[in-house]
């Protein structure tokens, strides 16, 4: 994702911009480019770094260089790491899955700001366009902030919101022409579809 694409996503109505710090991913963005992206975002858009099994020091170095306000942890990170990052004033979102299946029963272990729930059945963390039963998210969304992901697109995000009642939704491949290349028309359509269902989302994470 380029600086221009990030700015266009923000203008389309995105509440947050996710940037993946994971070299194996085709969407990987190094911390220097993160800073270029975050420097041009409006104050009401939250820059989020996505990490996979990274240690506290590496995450914080990227947070500081990239000027991130939130982190999304997509691996087997410990509750202690979540607590340490939260103590730094960060919004911490923990992805919940075990062996490619949503692991909603693990939420109570983590002092996180919110939880990303998806099927996680692909070869890389996130962005695999795999759908699952979105209504399963209701098992925790009633009392814990939830970010819903997994096979979302402009055509189905309204249905997903109605099914899972999340605080936010996370999309990647559903609005891309290629990994990391956003289709701004699709982003705009996606944001409009989310806004049309805004009245049923608790919004406990980014607003």
Which residues fall in each region the model found?
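Conserved N-terminal beta1-alpha1 strand-loop-helix module at the mouth
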Residues: 1-207
């Amino acid at each position: 994702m380029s600086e221009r694409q990030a700015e266009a996503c923000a203008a389309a109505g995105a509440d947050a911009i996710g940037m993946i710090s994971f070299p194996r991913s085709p969407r990987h963005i190094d911390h220097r480019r993160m800073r270029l992206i975050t420097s041009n975002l409006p104050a009401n858009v939250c820059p989020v770094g996505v990490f996979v099994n990274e240690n506290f020091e590496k995450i914080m170095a990227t947070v500081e260089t990239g000027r991130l306000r939130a982190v999304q942890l997509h691996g087997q990170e410990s509750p202690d790491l979540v607590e340490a990052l939260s103590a730094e004033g960060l919004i911490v979102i923990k992805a919940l899955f075990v062996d490619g299946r949503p692991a909603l029963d693990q939420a109570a272990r983590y002092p996180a700001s919110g939880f990303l729930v998806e099927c996680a059945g692909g070869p890389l963390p996130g962005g695999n366009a795999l759908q699952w039963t979105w209504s399963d998210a209701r098992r925790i969304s009633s009392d814990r902030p939830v970010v819903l992901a997994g096979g979302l697109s402009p055509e189905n995000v309204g249905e997903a919101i109605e099914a899972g009642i999340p605080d936010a939704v996370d999309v990647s491949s559903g609005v891309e022409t290629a990994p990391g290349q956003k289709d701004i028309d699709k982003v705009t359509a996606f944001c409009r579809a989310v806004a049309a269902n805004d009245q049923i989302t608790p919004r406990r994470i980014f607003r």
